[in-house]
Amino acid sequence: MADEAGTRSAGGRPIPAAEPLRPALSRQRSQGAVHLRVAPAGTAADAPTRIVDLAESGPLRLRCPRQGAERMLEGVLVNTGGGIACGDVFTVSVTVEPGGACVLTTTAAEKIYRSDGPCAEIVNRASVGAGGRLDWLPQETILFDRARLVRRFEADLAPDASLLVAEIAVLGRAARGESLEQALFEDRWRIRRDGRLVYADSLRLDGAVTALMNRRAIGGGARALATILDLSLRAEGRLDEARALLDALPAQVEAGASAWNGHLAVRMLAPTVAPLRDAAARFLAAWRGQPMPRVWQT
């Protein structure tokens, strides 16, 4: 028997109507972005570079610890969220106007957390005008087990612009004895000079990444890898200098350099991140002829 209050039980007590099903909670995705434009503060050859435009959104921020008379502006990217989770999308774009000079780094290692399916995405874009220079020197990226990361670096350079890029990837948290039993790391670089593609590089590690890196023909047991790329007018002619610097690195770091098509590339592999990070910092400081950004030393 029923009335407007709802269905009644056999004892005559009303049975409350069932509440509608609530939709399953969806995981909150984070979208962060920094869009930066810098230019010289004057026409002198040694005029310091200053920020012209800056837009920030989500957890990404930019800080400039040094705003002195130095020609090169130093910027530090900060992820206030502390890491990158599945489905997050982080975008950084930087424009260096003609004659400007800028070095960008990160405040700490970037952590890529385990994923329940979707990939995290990092998109970095750069444009460097005539006579400009950009040094892209983030600290290492650490992938947790079951992390899924797709990263892209794209740059457009004027005919006489300079670009130096260094990226370090760490496959698992060695301090915890972690291996990547299941993960995805896809890294895609595309560099154009005067509109023409001059450098293209793609890496894809998918599945049992640690097992893949244990293969002699792939990683020889390495858990940390670095790529350093110099696209400047003198880079190709400095190959012997680069190899001499690499020969002085510790034995546990395997490294090689090659130069062609107006640029120079360095690869490094190591069983753990500490010696590789130190080796990359030593090489870059000598190569650039100036110290690494201060956050690298903390």
Swiss-Prot record:
Keywords: Chaperone, Cytoplasm, Nickel insertion. Residues 1-30 are annotated as: Disordered. It is found in: Cytoplasm. GO terms for molecular function: nickel cation binding. Its main location: cytoplasm. InterPro entries: UreD. GO terms for cellular component: cytoplasm. UreD, UreF and UreG form a complex that acts as a GTP-hydrolysis-dependent molecular chaperone, activating the urease apoprotein by helping to assemble the nickel containing metallocenter of UreC. The UreE protein probably delivers the nickel. Required for maturation of urease via the functional incorporation of the urease nickel metallocenter. Belongs to the UreD family. This is Urease accessory protein UreD 3. The lineage of its organism: Bacteria, Pseudomonadati, Pseudomonadota, Alphaproteobacteria, Hyphomicrobiales.
